[in-house]
Design a protein with these regions (language model features):
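Hydrophobic alpha-helical segments at protein termini of multi-pass membrane proteins
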Residues: 1-234
Length: 234
């Protein structure tokens, strides 16, 4: 009976499985913030990340139609759209809001937006195997996306946040420069990961995920660096 129910309403289970990794990562990163952000802004940033998927997917389909035979270009454009729209949504929700009052806040809100994005993305990926009653496939896809996609989105969005955090107390022009650098680095990171996944043999996928984990460790160190930044002009 349970199997019949989830096959009839696959979105429910897919969403539960899609949001669980996001909640784990959200708890992990929020506890790193010594000055917790308002729950309302966290929630809105998460929802904003989810909503950005609704714009990103149609644009990615258009790109695929025209450049699907140019692998590097198509993956770069896909990554660009994802990183830009994740940023744009959270920028208008939180980053330009007065609640963003310390360097580390940029990282936190961008990670929350990324988790909203990956929750919706994970949900869409899991619907089909659930609908087909492929429980094993659902578990495998869920775990792989927990290890790969979730970490990738966290790391790429946090890259933008780190650059913004490093420039938090700098001039407006320097902030724009750091932001531009952050977006470029995030796109390169995101596109490179996707290209590695496609071009590497299946047996090497875990080594790629290992590289992402190394990146997360580096992210943690940079997170602590940004937390230590103070406004010397005060």
């Amino acid at each position: 009976m349970f199997l019949e129910f989830i096959q009839k309403y696959p979105f429910i289970l897919a969403f539960i499985l899609g949001i669980m990794p996001a909640l784990i990562w959200m708890w992990f990163w929020l506890k790193e913030d010594t000055h917790p952000e308002p729950a309302k802004m966290i929630t809105l940033s998460f929802i904003g990340g989810m909503l950005s998927v609704l714009i990103v997917l149609p644009l990615q389909k258009i790109i695929y139609t025209y450049v699907h035979n140019q692998e590097t270009l198509s993956f770069t454009l896909w990554a660009s759209i994802e990183e830009i729209f994740k940023f744009v949504f959270v920028y208008f929700i939180a980053l330009r809001n007065k609640v963003t009052d310390e360097p580390v806040d940029d990282i936190v809100y961008l990670i929350i937006s990324a988790l909203g994005f990956v929750t919706f993305e994970n949900t869409l990926f899991l619907i089909e195997p659930i609908k087909n009653g492929d429980i094993i496939g659902t578990i495998i896809n869920g775990n792989m996306r927990f290890l790969g996609a979730s970490l990738l989105h966290i790391m790429s969005s946090a890259t933008i946040g780190i650059c913004m955090g490093l420039a938090f107390y700098k001039s407006r022009s320097r902030k724009r420069e750091y932001l531009t650098l952050g977006i470029i680095l995030a796109i390169i990171l995101h596109a490179s990961f996707n290209l590695f996944i496609i071009n590497r043999a299946p047996g090497n996928i875990f080594s790629i995920f290992g590289m992402v984990w190394v990146g997360i460790i580096a992210l943690l160190l940079l997170f602590e660096k940004v937390k230590s930044i103070r406004n010397l002009q005060i």
